[in-house]
Amino acid sequence: MDLPGPIHEILVLFGGFGLLLGGLGVVLLTNPIYSAFSLGLVLVCISLFYFLLNSYFVAVAQLLIYVGAINVLIIFAVMFVNGSEWSKDKNYWTIGDGFTLLLCITIPFSLMTTIPDTSWYGILWTTRSNQIVEQGLINNVQQIGIHLATDFYLPFELISLILLVSLIGAITMARQ
């Protein structure tokens, strides 16, 4: 970023202090939830340093990928750690359970109706004639987006489905 000197130095000091505090929290805290939050703080501070170094794409990727992965880590930690006394004593049917049931019923039916009607051949062999491919007009981020939307569309979607199935499997294993 093009920031004035004092503001840039304050942000660097804030990021360094956050890194030290978060690193100590990861090592010293015994609760896995607090430790995962501390690791999230470390990763957000690293992303701040990428922003300060004018590497915006890497900073956003750091936030989306690594901090998002920390949220998954928190979910796994909550699932595998013993539940609280309240969750063992009371068994209520909540609005969230009904909403989840509705989603679990409607999503497979919508997939069964849309997947057979999709022209997969047209998706796999999308031409780039209607896109700007002149190297001077697009940057690296746009090139990554073009490749994900054309060449790697089907593998990208398959990987997301595999991750979804693994998350559902982990939730099922944790409940048993």
Curated annotation (Swiss-Prot):
A Pfam family this chain is assigned to: Oxidored_q3
Entry keyword set: Chloroplast, Membrane, NAD, NADP, Plastid, Plastoquinone, Quinone, Thylakoid, Translocase, Transmembrane, Transmembrane helix, Transport
Gene3D superfamilies documented for this protein: NADH-ubiquinone/plastoquinone oxidoreductase chain 6, subunit NuoJ
Membrane-spanning parts: 10-30, 33-53, 60-80, 95-115, 152-172
Keyword DNA-binding: no
Main enzyme class: translocase
InterPro entries, sorted: NAD(P)H-Q_Oxidoreduct_6 (IPR050290), NADH_UbQ/plastoQ_OxRdtase_su6 (IPR001457), Nuo/plastoQ_OxRdtase_6_NuoJ (IPR042106)
Gene Ontology annotations for the cellular component aspect, listed alphabetically: chloroplast thylakoid membrane
Entry's localization field: Plastid, Chloroplast thylakoid membrane
Enzyme Commission code(s) on record: 7.1.1.-
Membrane topology of the entry: Multi-pass membrane protein
GO molecular function annotation: NADH dehydrogenase (ubiquinone) activity; quinone binding
Reactions performed catalytically: a plastoquinone + NADH + (n+1) H(+)(in) = a plastoquinol + NAD(+) + n H(+)(out); a plastoquinone + NADPH + (n+1) H(+)(in) = a plastoquinol + NADP(+) + n H(+)(out)
The protein's role, per its UniProt record: NDH shuttles electrons from NAD(P)H:plastoquinone, via FMN and iron-sulfur (Fe-S) centers, to quinones in the photosynthetic chain and possibly in a chloroplast respiratory chain. The immediate electron acceptor for the enzyme in this species is believed to be plastoquinone. Couples the redox reaction to proton translocation, and thus conserves the redox energy in a proton gradient.
Recorded family membership: Belongs to the complex I subunit 6 family.
Assembly behavior: NDH is composed of at least 16 different subunits, 5 of which are encoded in the nucleus.
Protein name from the UniProt record: NAD(P)H-quinone oxidoreductase subunit 6, chloroplastic
Organism of derivation: Zea mays (Maize)
Gene that encodes it: ndhG
